[in-house]
Amino acid sequence: MNYFELFKFSPAFDIDTAVLAERYRELQRAVHPDKFAHDTEQQKLLSVQRTAQVNDGYQTLKDPIRRAEHLLSLRGIDLSHETTTVKDTVFLMQQMEWREALEDIRHSTDPQESIDELYQSFAEYRAKLTHMLTVQLNSSKDEDALLAADQVRKLKFMAKLHDELTRIEDALLD
Protein backbone atom coordinates (compact mmCIF):
# COMPACT_ATOMS: atom_id res chain seq x y z
CA MET A 1 0.00 0.00 0.00
CA ASN A 2 1.19 3.49 -0.83
CA TYR A 3 0.73 5.48 2.36
CA PHE A 4 1.48 8.74 0.58
CA GLU A 5 -1.60 8.19 -1.60
CA LEU A 6 -3.66 7.19 1.45
CA PHE A 7 -2.78 10.48 3.16
CA LYS A 8 -2.93 12.51 -0.08
CA PHE A 9 0.77 13.44 -0.19
CA SER A 10 3.11 13.37 -3.14
CA PRO A 11 5.79 10.77 -2.45
CA ALA A 12 8.56 12.85 -0.83
CA PHE A 13 10.80 12.63 2.19
CA ASP A 14 9.85 16.10 3.45
CA ILE A 15 6.20 16.22 4.46
CA ASP A 16 4.25 18.55 6.70
CA THR A 17 3.71 16.51 9.86
CA ALA A 18 0.97 18.86 11.08
CA VAL A 19 -0.98 18.18 7.88
CA LEU A 20 -0.23 14.47 8.32
CA ALA A 21 -1.73 14.54 11.83
CA GLU A 22 -4.81 16.39 10.58
CA ARG A 23 -5.37 13.91 7.74
CA TYR A 24 -4.82 11.04 10.15
CA ARG A 25 -7.63 12.30 12.40
CA GLU A 26 -9.91 12.73 9.36
CA LEU A 27 -9.21 9.20 8.13
CA GLN A 28 -9.66 7.77 11.63
CA ARG A 29 -13.08 9.38 11.89
CA ALA A 30 -14.06 8.04 8.45
CA VAL A 31 -13.05 4.41 9.06
CA HIS A 32 -13.46 4.00 12.82
CA PRO A 33 -15.17 0.68 13.67
CA ASP A 34 -17.77 2.44 15.87
CA LYS A 35 -19.23 4.01 12.71
CA PHE A 36 -19.94 0.50 11.43
CA ALA A 37 -21.35 -1.03 14.63
CA HIS A 38 -24.74 -1.71 13.00
CA ASP A 39 -23.39 -2.88 9.63
CA THR A 40 -22.65 -6.37 8.37
CA GLU A 41 -19.79 -8.42 9.77
CA GLN A 42 -17.96 -7.93 6.49
CA GLN A 43 -18.26 -4.13 6.80
CA LYS A 44 -17.05 -4.30 10.41
CA LEU A 45 -14.05 -6.40 9.39
CA LEU A 46 -13.26 -4.05 6.52
CA SER A 47 -13.42 -1.10 8.92
CA VAL A 48 -10.97 -2.79 11.31
CA GLN A 49 -8.60 -3.51 8.41
CA ARG A 50 -8.80 0.06 7.12
CA THR A 51 -8.22 1.40 10.64
CA ALA A 52 -5.10 -0.76 10.91
CA GLN A 53 -3.88 0.53 7.52
CA VAL A 54 -4.46 4.13 8.56
CA ASN A 55 -2.63 3.58 11.86
CA ASP A 56 0.30 1.85 10.17
CA GLY A 57 0.45 4.50 7.47
CA TYR A 58 0.48 7.28 10.04
CA GLN A 59 3.25 5.63 12.08
CA THR A 60 5.25 5.03 8.89
CA LEU A 61 4.97 8.57 7.55
CA LYS A 62 5.46 10.19 10.96
CA ASP A 63 8.85 8.52 11.52
CA PRO A 64 11.58 9.81 9.16
CA ILE A 65 13.42 6.48 8.94
CA ARG A 66 10.26 4.49 8.28
CA ARG A 67 9.13 7.15 5.78
CA ALA A 68 12.43 6.83 3.92
CA GLU A 69 12.13 3.03 3.92
CA HIS A 70 8.60 3.34 2.53
CA LEU A 71 9.76 5.72 -0.21
CA LEU A 72 12.52 3.29 -1.14
CA SER A 73 10.09 0.36 -1.15
CA LEU A 74 7.93 2.27 -3.63
CA ARG A 75 11.04 2.44 -5.81
CA GLY A 76 11.65 -1.30 -5.48
CA ILE A 77 14.22 -1.26 -2.67
CA ASP A 78 12.99 -3.23 0.35
CA LEU A 79 15.02 -2.65 3.52
CA SER A 80 12.56 -4.21 5.95
CA HIS A 81 14.12 -7.68 6.19
CA GLU A 82 17.60 -7.10 4.92
CA THR A 83 20.86 -7.97 6.58
CA THR A 84 23.12 -5.81 4.42
CA THR A 85 25.76 -4.03 6.45
CA VAL A 86 27.20 -0.58 5.94
CA LYS A 87 30.46 -0.68 3.99
CA ASP A 88 31.41 3.00 4.37
CA THR A 89 34.79 2.88 6.15
CA VAL A 90 34.52 6.46 7.44
CA PHE A 91 31.18 5.63 9.04
CA LEU A 92 32.54 2.36 10.41
CA MET A 93 35.44 4.24 12.04
CA GLN A 94 33.00 6.76 13.51
CA GLN A 95 30.87 3.88 14.75
CA MET A 96 33.90 2.39 16.54
CA GLU A 97 34.65 5.76 18.15
CA TRP A 98 31.07 6.03 19.40
CA ARG A 99 31.17 2.47 20.77
CA GLU A 100 34.40 3.26 22.64
CA ALA A 101 32.88 6.48 23.98
CA LEU A 102 29.84 4.52 25.20
CA GLU A 103 32.12 2.11 27.04
CA ASP A 104 34.17 4.96 28.53
CA ILE A 105 31.10 6.65 30.06
CA ARG A 106 31.00 4.19 32.95
CA HIS A 107 34.58 5.13 33.89
CA SER A 108 34.29 8.85 33.25
CA THR A 109 34.82 11.38 36.04
CA ASP A 110 31.91 13.37 34.59
CA PRO A 111 29.59 10.86 32.93
CA GLN A 112 26.85 13.42 32.22
CA GLU A 113 29.27 15.58 30.25
CA SER A 114 30.33 12.53 28.23
CA ILE A 115 26.69 11.64 27.62
CA ASP A 116 25.87 15.18 26.51
CA GLU A 117 28.85 15.21 24.14
CA LEU A 118 27.73 11.93 22.59
CA TYR A 119 24.15 13.17 22.17
CA GLN A 120 25.58 16.26 20.43
CA SER A 121 27.82 14.15 18.20
CA PHE A 122 24.87 11.92 17.27
CA ALA A 123 22.66 14.93 16.49
CA GLU A 124 25.27 16.53 14.23
CA TYR A 125 25.97 13.32 12.33
CA ARG A 126 22.26 12.49 12.05
CA ALA A 127 21.57 15.97 10.62
CA LYS A 128 24.29 15.44 8.01
CA LEU A 129 22.90 12.00 7.06
CA THR A 130 19.34 13.31 6.94
CA HIS A 131 20.36 16.13 4.60
CA MET A 132 22.09 13.68 2.25
CA LEU A 133 19.10 11.34 2.48
CA THR A 134 16.71 14.14 1.53
CA VAL A 135 18.76 15.06 -1.53
CA GLN A 136 19.07 11.43 -2.61
CA LEU A 137 15.38 10.63 -2.13
CA ASN A 138 14.39 13.70 -4.12
CA SER A 139 16.48 12.46 -7.04
CA SER A 140 14.99 10.15 -9.65
CA LYS A 141 18.31 8.41 -10.33
CA ASP A 142 18.52 4.73 -9.38
CA GLU A 143 22.04 5.15 -7.99
CA ASP A 144 20.77 7.88 -5.65
CA ALA A 145 18.09 5.51 -4.37
CA LEU A 146 20.81 2.97 -3.56
CA LEU A 147 22.83 5.67 -1.79
CA ALA A 148 19.69 6.68 0.12
CA ALA A 149 19.32 3.08 1.26
CA ASP A 150 22.83 3.31 2.73
CA GLN A 151 21.88 6.50 4.58
CA VAL A 152 18.82 4.74 6.01
CA ARG A 153 21.00 1.86 7.21
CA LYS A 154 23.28 4.36 8.94
CA LEU A 155 20.36 6.19 10.52
CA LYS A 156 18.92 2.91 11.80
CA PHE A 157 22.26 2.07 13.37
CA MET A 158 22.44 5.53 14.94
CA ALA A 159 18.94 5.11 16.37
CA LYS A 160 20.13 1.92 18.11
CA LEU A 161 23.20 3.72 19.46
CA HIS A 162 21.00 6.57 20.69
CA ASP A 163 18.77 4.07 22.50
CA GLU A 164 21.83 2.47 24.06
CA LEU A 165 23.08 5.86 25.24
CA THR A 166 19.67 6.60 26.75
CA ARG A 167 19.77 3.27 28.63
CA ILE A 168 23.24 4.09 29.97
CA GLU A 169 22.05 7.53 31.07
CA ASP A 170 18.98 6.04 32.77
CA ALA A 171 21.14 3.46 34.58
CA LEU A 172 23.44 6.20 35.86
CA LEU A 173 20.47 8.14 37.21
CA ASP A 174 19.15 5.14 39.15
UniProtKB/Swiss-Prot annotation:
Coiled coil: none annotated. SMART domains: DnaJ. PROSITE patterns: DNAJ_2. Keywords: Chaperone. Residues 2-74 form the J domain. Belongs to the HscB family. This is Co-chaperone protein HscB homolog.
